[in-house]
């Protein structure tokens, strides 16, 4: 019944506590946890594991190569590739998206941050950022600076602040079906063939 169908893809970047070589760690939070609870999750979910001694923003070329290979090998719709991550993965989301904005139909960084001077690279990419205002690990100003910089250059950005919430802004975000509906509302234009 799904022959010939091309699926939307979500690339999920985990937090620092899930680095290493044990894939079971990656399943503790975020998209992998949602997929385990929802067998009919309507996306191809890609959840790589960051090596122990590095951070996602240092893995940007590797992540790009991974995405390229997945799009080439599998039935993925290249106009519906979405990116999200929490904490270290939120930083990685900003870094990967600002480096390769043409890849993504929409992104959702959670309790992360980036380089505000690079934010305008995302002015054509819908962004929905999330952060708890009581986060003791990654201060909310990290997200605020990126959101403000993106707004200044006319970007399509939403910002959800969870009042009284600490570092775990991701459980509430990933358990909310509205996020996935929002992702699916966004699609990149088809690339014209030359």
Identify the meaning behind each predicted range.
Residues 1-9, 122-124:
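Proline/glycine-enriched tight loop/beta-turn segments at coil->beta junctions
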Residues 1-5, 51-88, 101-103:
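Gly/Ser-rich "nucleophile elbow"/oxyanion-hole loop immediately N-terminal to the catalytic nucleophile
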Residues 7-9, 13-64:
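Active-site machinery of serine-nucleophile hydrolases
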Residues 50, 108-116:
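Active-site nucleophile loop of the alpha/beta-hydrolase fold
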Residues 83-85, 110, 130:
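Short beta-strand immediately N-terminal to the catalytic nucleophile in serine-hydrolase-like folds
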Residues 90-101, 107:
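Short glycine-enriched nucleophile-adjacent loop
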Residues 126-130, 134-194:
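C-terminal catalytic histidine-bearing segment of alpha/beta-hydrolase fold enzymes
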């Amino acid at each position: 019944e799904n022959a010939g169908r091309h699926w939307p893809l979500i690339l999920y970047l985990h937090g620092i506590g899930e680095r290493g070589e044990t894939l079971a760690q990656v399943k503790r939070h975020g998209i992998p946890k949602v997929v385990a609870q929802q067998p009919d999750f309507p996306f191809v979910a890609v959840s790589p594991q960051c090596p122990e001694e590095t951070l996602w923003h240092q893995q940007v070329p590797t992540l790009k190569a991974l995405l390229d290979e997945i799009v080439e090998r599998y039935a993925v719709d290249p106009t519906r590739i979405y990116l999200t991550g929490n904490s270290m993965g939120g930083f990685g989301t900003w870094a990967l998206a600002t480096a390769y904005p043409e890849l993504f139909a929409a992104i959702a960084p959670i309790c992360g941050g980036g380089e505000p001077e690079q934010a305008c690279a995302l002015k054509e990419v819908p962004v929905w950022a999330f952060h708890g205002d009581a986060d003791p690990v990654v201060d909310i100003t990290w997200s605020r600076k990126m959101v403000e910089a993106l707004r200044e250059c006319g970007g399509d950005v939403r910002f959800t602040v969870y009042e009284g919430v600490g570092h775990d802004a991701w459980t509430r975000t990933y358990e909310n079906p509205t996020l996935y509906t929002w992702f699916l509302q966004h699609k990149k234009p088809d690339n014209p063939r030359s």
